[in-house]
Amino acid sequence: RCSYDRKHETIYILNEIYKRGMSNRQLAEEIAPLVEGDTKGSSYLSPVSGLCFQDHSDIYCDAAEPKSISDLKDCGLKQARACHKEPGCVSYRVKWLQHRRIVIDPKRTPEAYREFVNYSYATDKDGNFLSELPDKDNHTIDACAYALDRLIYRRGVSA
């Protein structure tokens, strides 16, 4: 779960579900208590910053997984939807994230903390940075970008 403070361009990563080998049904069971009864959104106090945020229970998923999205909806998570998908969108999302301050509590979200701290551009055999971003060890980074999809692709907002 992420929140975004537009005024300060700050992303708060508030909690995570990070488990390997889960079925879509098991994932839905983990997510449901976090969004139950929250279809219109509510406000809450961030445990990280102490700031009040508007929370929306939209669930953005990898657009390459339409069957998984359908499964989540079949399990009662009607707010599951595909994130924006077009050529270059992964690079654009990461660029958008790079231009914001990101606050991560390593105790509440250890996997997100690990990934964000360790993620970097690919290197060649001599250790020189390449322009490409590796598509590995970035599951929580992807999840954060999916969660903020509506903001990232909002008209008039740039990376």
Positions of PLM-derived features:
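Mg2+-dependent endonuclease catalytic cores in nucleic-acid-processing enzymes, primarily RNase H-like
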Residues: 7-135, 152-155
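Gly/Thr-rich phosphate-binding beta-strand-loop-beta motif of the actin/hexokinase/Hsp70
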Residues: 1-5
